[in-house]
């Protein structure tokens, strides 16, 4: 079960209700987490960081999965503010907090992908794929359990000249999303490139 925002409801109504709820009961760590997440959705990065750092400081905020999510949202906020070093540090904290979740590894892998740090992409996607039991909580995100880990690995392997391994990952990504035309195209291109290489080999 993947949790997504309800497209039939305007997000505009969520924020004032959450702010009011936190104002009325500042000891409710769950609502504080939700408020920080809503600030992230709105692009209010400083408010997100402030709110979720407060969430993490609360003695009642003990659920590791949710704490890791707060750390990931703080990391994304720093990333959007242009501070990759702080973003990296918060992603690593999220991994340490909940090493049983794929999402923190995948968030960091995506950041490293944008930075073209291919070895890092391969390491953290590999860590994510080593987690084979999918948690049944709202923290779990579909991307981390779909084609994305294999897709990023395909790109990283291709960029580092390992085309045969890239093809393996391209096929694995396509198996997760058979109707995706881009993934199908990746497989076709790599098969063609490898076929041409084999034909030109002495």
What do the predicted segments below correspond to?
Residues 1-50, 54, 202:
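Catalytic-site signature of metal-activated, phosphate-bearing donor transferases
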Residues 11, 45-46, 84, 118, ...:
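TPR-repeat structural position
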Residues 34, 73, 107-110, 114, ...:
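"A position-specific structural signal for the A-helix of alpha-solenoid helical repeats
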């Amino acid at each position: 079960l993947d949790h997504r925002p309800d497209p039939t409801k305007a997000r505009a109504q969520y924020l004032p209700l959450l702010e009011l709820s936190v104002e009325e009961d500042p000891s409710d760590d769950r609502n504080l987490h939700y408020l920080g997440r809503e600030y992230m959705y709105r692009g209010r990065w400083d408010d997100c960081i402030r709110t979720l750092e407060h969430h993490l400081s609360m003695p009642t905020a003990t659920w590791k999965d949710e704490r890791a999510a707060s750390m990931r949202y703080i990391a994304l906020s720093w990333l959007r503010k242009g501070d990759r070093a702080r973003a990296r540090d918060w992603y690593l904290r999220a991994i340490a907090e909940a090493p049983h979740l794929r999402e923190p590894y995948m968030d960091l892998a995506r950041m490293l992908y944008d930075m073209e740090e291919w070895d890092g992409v391969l390491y953290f996607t590999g860590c994510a794929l080593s987690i084979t039991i999918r948690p049944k909580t709202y923290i779990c995100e579909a991307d981390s359990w779909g084609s994305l880990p294999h897709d990023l690995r395909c790109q990283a392997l291709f960029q580092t000249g390992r085309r045969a391994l890239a093809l393996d990952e391209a096929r694995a990504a396509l198996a997760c999303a058979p109707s995706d035309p881009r993934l199908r195209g990746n497989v076709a291109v790599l098969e063609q490139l490898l076929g041409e290489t084999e034909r030109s080999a002495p």
